[in-house]
């Protein structure tokens, strides 16, 4: 287990930390808000694709759209975001944090317009690729920019604002999706859903034309006067805090130059990270945090909220979207929990408690879908599949093997023809014209359904069950638990873990891990639901989160109360800390130094 005693104030630079927190003005909040619009765009895209994909498969020029194409269109964005996050690290070191954020807002605007105008599935895919690049840029650089441009006493709160805006984006996406679902949704409404994303992207672009670069980046690139001016605005004119931050940044930069001299010829920053044990350790821990966050299934729940609600037994698309508004609103409200507590109870405790809640509600989600499966109507015996039934129709043999409605409708090629009299049904294949309103053969074939409409009902994605509301209620508590800590804290911790010279590259790697596993989880959800059942899928996510809980308990340190540069020492061995202390003492040329007192008792 990690045990860390407090680092002496000012342990990084030798400058005594001011005894009282500064009063912050409007500027720092305006700066942080403008940056975390990137989080809003992240959340909006995650939420709007869930609503839009209820209608995109019916759009002229795009249909037919099978589950593989749907998974590609949904999942290409997180896949490309992984590439974008990796590229934005070196890019932000060279061009600056501000320019990368501006580039992200421009790319997002173009991507939203292309998605809205798409007349084929390929064009829609291109738009989704551009959105992925923009989100990758923003998800990596926004937490870094906010952490480097925030007063240390509210840094955790402001970085948590990134996650808050993700949840705001989710809420707005579902509201916009609900509103536009009444405007010819199959041809026009889904286009308006995608187009709306250009509005906040343009707002962010305009804001950043007037906002400064990160003071740490400015100092590192020799623009020390500008760095001091920006810090003066951030700290609202409190010169003792400005001097303290300048000393911290100066010491960190001197250490970077020393490290570069020691590792001359080692090549790119990533090679230096891998050859520096304590930074390598921090990057591995940070990357695993991001990986485990995605393996909890969160973005599966976000991307496929509509599918999950329909699977629970809600048939109407409008109702599905408005229920999504409620669930995303709970997610938004839950984000205020870490904002209120992150600087009081610390990152580590909040993360552990949140993960325990996620585990419990993943178990409950799995149980709820198991109950739905057991309660769904059974299929007739095979010998009863006689009336107008053609066993040679494509997928007929596969549909025939399913024993109940839930198993049947989970397969994308099958629907359930329910007998209102017998309280059983037939599992029948969809027709080749991609219609979901009737079966390709059997009693619910178009002509038969018309003649026998009062006796039979065709269900394409859901089953009648008395447990309909249960998964929806559990999903609300799952999202509340997740947003209370597991959502923001991997981002907060990764923004704090690394020294200045490694920060952009290490955060790029950890963010890429988030997006890669986002891609893996979202790309496999529909297929996994068919192979392992819906309830089995959530039990798998639960198992992954249990492993994550053990990992966090033993390997993730508390960073509350430390400056960004002090956090680096939490990952050092005792011998490395002694050497670091010696360098600190020598750098002050005999001046009295506060000693560094801490222990990092763990094996990694």
Curated annotation (Swiss-Prot):
Disulfide bonds: none annotated. Keywords: Cell membrane, Glycoprotein, Membrane, Transmembrane, Transmembrane helix, Transport. Residues 1-23, 93-99, 143-157, 213-281, 342-351, 490-505, 557-604 are cytoplasmic. Residues 1-20 are annotated as: Disordered. It is found in: Cell membrane; Perikaryon. Expressed in the intestine and sheath glial cells. It comes from the Eukaryota. GO terms for molecular function: myo-inositol:proton symporter activity. The chain crosses the membrane at residues 24-44, 72-92, 100-120, 122-142, 158-178, 192-212, 282-302, 321-341, 352-372, 469-489, 506-526, 536-556. Residues 45-71, 121, 179-191, 303-320, 373-468, 527-535 are extracellular. One of its GO terms (cellular component) is perikaryon. It is a multi-pass membrane protein. It catalyses: myo-inositol(out) + H(+)(out) = myo-inositol(in) + H(+)(in). Its main location: membrane. Glycans are attached at residues 58, 317, 374, 384, 448, 452. PANTHER family: PROTON MYO-INOSITOL COTRANSPORTER. This is Proton myo-inositol cotransporter hmit-1.3. It comes from Caenorhabditis elegans. The lineage of its organism: Eukaryota, Metazoa, Ecdysozoa, Nematoda, Chromadorea. The gene is hmit-1.3.
């Amino acid at each position: 287990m990690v045990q860390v005693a407090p680092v002496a104030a000012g342990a990084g630079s030798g400058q005594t930390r001011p005894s009282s927190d500064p009063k912050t003005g409007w500027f720092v909040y305006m700066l942080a808000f403008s940056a975390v619009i990137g989080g809003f765009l992240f959340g909006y895209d995650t939420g709007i694709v869930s609503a839009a994909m209820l209608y995109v498969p019916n759009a002229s020029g795009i249909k037919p759209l099978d589950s593989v194409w749907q998974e590609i269109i949904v999942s290409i964005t997180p896949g490309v975001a992984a590439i974008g996050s990796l590229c934005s690290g070196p890019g932000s070191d060279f061009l600056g944090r501000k320019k990368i954020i501006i580039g992200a807002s421009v790319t997002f605007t173009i991507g939203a317009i292309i998605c809205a105008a798409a007349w084929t599935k390929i064009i829609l895919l291109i738009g989704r690729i551009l959105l992925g690049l923009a989100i990758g840029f923003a998800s990596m650089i926004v937490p870094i920019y906010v952490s480097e441009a925030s007063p240390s006493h509210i840094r955790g709160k402001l970085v948590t604002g990134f996650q808050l805006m993700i949840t705001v984006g989710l809420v707005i996406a579902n509201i916009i999706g609900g509103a536009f679902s009444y405007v010819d949704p199959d041809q026009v409404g889904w286009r308006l859903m995608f187009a709306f994303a250009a509005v906040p992207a343009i707002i962010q672009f305009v804001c950043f034309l007037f906002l400064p670069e990160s003071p740490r980046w400015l100092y590192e690139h020799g623009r020390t006067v500008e760095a001091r001016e920006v810090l003066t605005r951030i700290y609202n004119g409190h010169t003792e805090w400005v001097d303290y931050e300048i000393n911290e940044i100066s010491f960190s930069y001197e250490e970077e130059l020393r490290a570069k001299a020691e590792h001359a010829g080692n090549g790119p920053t990533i090679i230096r990270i891998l050859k520096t044990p304590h930074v390598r350790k921090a990057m591995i821990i940070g990357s695993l945090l991001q990986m485990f966050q995605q393996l909890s299934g969160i973005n599966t729940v976000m991307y496929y909220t509509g599918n999950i609600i329909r699977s629970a037994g809600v048939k109407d698309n409008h109702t599905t979207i408005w229920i999504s508004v409620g669930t995303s609103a709970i997610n938004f409200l839950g984000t205020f929990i870490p904002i209120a507590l992150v600087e009081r109870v610390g990152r580590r405790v909040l993360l552990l408690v949140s993960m325990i809640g996620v585990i419990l509600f993943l178990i409950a989600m799995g149980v709820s879908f198991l109950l739905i499966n057991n309660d769904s109507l059974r299929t007739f015996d095979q010998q009863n599949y006689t009336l107008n039934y053609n066993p040679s129709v494509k997928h007929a043999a596969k549909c025939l093997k399913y024993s109940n409605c839930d198993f049947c409708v989970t397969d994308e090629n099958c629907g359930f023809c329910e007998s209102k009299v017998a309280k059983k049904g037939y599992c029948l294949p969809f027709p080749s014209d991609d219609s979901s309103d009737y079966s390709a053969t059997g009693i619910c074939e178009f002509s038969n359904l018309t003649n026998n409409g009062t006796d039979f009902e065709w269900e394409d994605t859901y089953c009648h069950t008395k447990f309909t509301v249960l998964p929806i209620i559990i999903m609300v508590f799952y999202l509340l638990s997740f947003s209370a800590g597991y959502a923001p804290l991997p981002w907060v911790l990764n923004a704090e873990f690394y020294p200045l010279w490694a920060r952009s590259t290490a955060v790029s790697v950890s963010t890429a891990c988030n997006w890669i596993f986002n891609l893996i989880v979202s790309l496999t959800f529909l297929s996994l639901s068919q192979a392992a059942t819906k309830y089995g899928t959530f039990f798998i996510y639960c198992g992954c989160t249990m492993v994550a809980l053990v990992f966090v308990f033993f390997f993730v340190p508390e960073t509350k109360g430390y400056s960004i540069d002090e956090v680096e020492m939490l990952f050092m061995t005792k011998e490395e800390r002694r050497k670091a202390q010696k360098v600190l003492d020598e750098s002050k040329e005999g001046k009295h130094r506060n000693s560094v007192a801490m222990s990092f008792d763990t094996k990694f």
